[in-house]
């Protein structure tokens, strides 16, 4: 779809499969672009001098992306790039808005707007195996403005994806000693 000499990466499909958001350095910094899934000229959505990475579509017309813009002292938790915030921007462009000061990675959004994601409590090499510590990632559900922790294993739980009925989700976990795929119902303490 892209033939530019720039570095294009991190493609994310829109829910209706008509658009793809991606990261590109074709204008200098790593910005968010959107392109029709059938091809064509991409539209630049962000113009910050920092790096932005698309993580999901909030709906067919808005892209969620991570960036360390640190908007105000009141809304920032940590003062470096380790814990980026989540922003939302229209696929038509315009001014981005702060979506979350929490670092939300691997976001999966249900049709009703509920969000599954894994957290980031501290720095840990994402490729490290058998990591068990207080900063290991956990799966969370954001629903109606409330947050509910979905996993409690002391090791890595990450990359949640809704099932087709959106009553449960798949995720990666090392609870049996190596990364495997598990299925869990929402707000349940047991896997399948």
PLM region spans:
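A flexible loop/linker signature enriched in serine peptidases of the S9 family
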Residues: 2-8, 23-33, 46-53, 61-87, ...
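Short coil/turn segments that connect the beta-strands within blades of beta-propeller domains
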Residues: 16-18, 60-62, 112-114, 165-167
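A structural motif corresponding to the C-terminal end of an alpha-helix
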Residues: 142-144
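Solvent-exposed beta-strand/loop surfaces of large extracellular or lumenal domains
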Residues: 190-192
């Amino acid at each position: 779809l892209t033939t530019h000499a720039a570095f294009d990466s991190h493609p994310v499909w829109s829910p209706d499969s008509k658009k793809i958001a991606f990261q590109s350095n074709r204008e200098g910094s790593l910005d968010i672009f959107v392109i029709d899934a059938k091809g064509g000229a991409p539209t630049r959505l962000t113009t910050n001098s920092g790096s932005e990475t698309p993580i999901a579509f909030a709906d067919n017309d808005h892209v969620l992306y991570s960036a360390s813009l640190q908007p105000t002292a009141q809304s920032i938790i940590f003062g470096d790039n380790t814990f980026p915030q989540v922003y939302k921007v229209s696929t038509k462009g315009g001014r981005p808005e702060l979506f979350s000061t929490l670092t939300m990675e691997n976001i999966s959004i249900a049709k009703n707007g509920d969000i599954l994601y894994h957290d980031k409590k501290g720095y840990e090499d994402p490729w490290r195996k058998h990591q068990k510590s207080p900063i290991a990632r956990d799966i969370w559900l954001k629903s109606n403005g409330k947050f509910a922790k979905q996993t409690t294993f002391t090791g890595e739980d990450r990359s949640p994806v809704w099932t087709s009925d959106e009553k449960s989700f798949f995720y990666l976990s090392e609870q049996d000693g190596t990364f495997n795929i598990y299925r869990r119902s929402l707000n349940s303490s047991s896997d399948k």
